[in-house]
Each structure stands twice: as structure tokens, then as C-alpha cells.
Amino acid sequence: MQYPKSMQKLALIAFLATSVLVVMIGTAWGVRLFTMYRNQAAQQQTAPVNYALGGFPMNGKLAPDFRLTDQFAQSVTLSTLRGREVVLAFIDSQCKSLCPLTATIMYTAKARLGSTAASKVVLIAVNANPTATSVAEVQAWSISHGMLHQWSFLTGTAQQLQSVYHSYNELVQVSSSGLVVHDSAMLIIDPTGHEQLYFETLDSIA
């Protein structure tokens, strides 16, 4: 039996939010929140979905550094964010399907931490569309989805972005018609700059 994609996505969202929150806050509150999201996900689906979602522990290596430009045309270097936990995701600047949902989860997860804990977390999105790389495009996407002042949406030249994709094993494919398919990945980087946890859901199609 096939279930609507919207229902499948809701289940994926719930599990992704759970994982991110538990990683960022190892408290009893976090465990309670984990239980809440898990129960909500169970209510959203009555059969297993076909898409895989998992959080995979990393080997703790230093996250590859990079310098890109944010939605305000300011240069951002990953290594300058040391001292705060980084939630790094790859977002297509033209995407209207899964990417907005990923952004919502990033925002909601951070908001639920409370002001003190949230001040120690930085949300970073790297443009997953090497054909739509202007600052205006990542700014417009951020405005459209209520994220303008909630994260840094980073972009650069196609060559710069391809270098980041390669460093983070992010698969990005552009068809002859311009359709972009990329891994919907989220990475947790600890305050010392080391990779801690990796999440991957279904591929995102713009």
C-alpha cells in the first residue's frame, strides 16, 4: 500500500528533529522531547516508509574548512565558528520540496533549546545548487522561508561549491534540463570543529 508523500515527509521530519535535538542537548528534557517526537511520528504513519533515515556517528575527524559567502554578502569561514556547535546542511537555493522542510526542522530544533543553549548553536546551510549561486538567490530563498536572520546560507562560485561537496562527500547532480538532485544531508560539528554525527534522508529533488 502506498502512502502520500506528504505523510512520509512528516514522519521523516519528526525523526530528523528528534535526532538533531538529542545530539545538541543530552539532558532529561531532550529525552522527553525525543519521546514526544517519536510518538508523533508513530501517529503520522501506520506502516514503514520506504525512505531511509539514520544518524550515523562520525569518526571525530576535523571538519574540512571552507570559506564561502552568506546571504548578506559577508565572508564566512567554518573554522571561525569554533566554540559553538554547528548544524550543517546542504540546501538547494531553488528547491521547493524537501529543503524547506529541512530548514524548518533546523529552526525549530534550535528554538526549542531555549535562549542560553541556542546561543551556542549555529545553523549553516551550504548551497547545493551549483547553477544558482548568486547571493541574491540564497538571500531570496532565506527570506521566502523565514530564515534570513536565523542561519547563514552560504554560496560561492560553482567551483568553490563543488570543492565543499567533495570535501563532505555530498553528491550533487544536475541534469541536462537543469534539475538538481542532491543528498539531503545534515552534519553535527562539535565546538572543537570535529565531525560528530551525520544524518541522511531521501534525496532532495528541486
What do the predicted segments below correspond to?
Residues M1-D65:
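N-terminal targeting signals for export/organelle localization
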Residues R67-L68, I188:
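Hydrophobic beta-strand positions
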Residues R84-E85, T102-A125:
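Conserved helix-turn-beta segment immediately C-terminal to the redox Cys motif
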Residues A63-P64, V86, D183-A185:
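Short loop/turn microsegments at loop-to-beta-strand junctions
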Residues V76-M106:
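Short active-site neighborhood of thiol/selenol oxidoreductases, capturing the structured segment around
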Residues I124, Q139-D183:
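Short, internal strand/loop/helix patches
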Residues S175-A206:
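Thiol-/selenol-based redox modules, centered on thioredoxin-like
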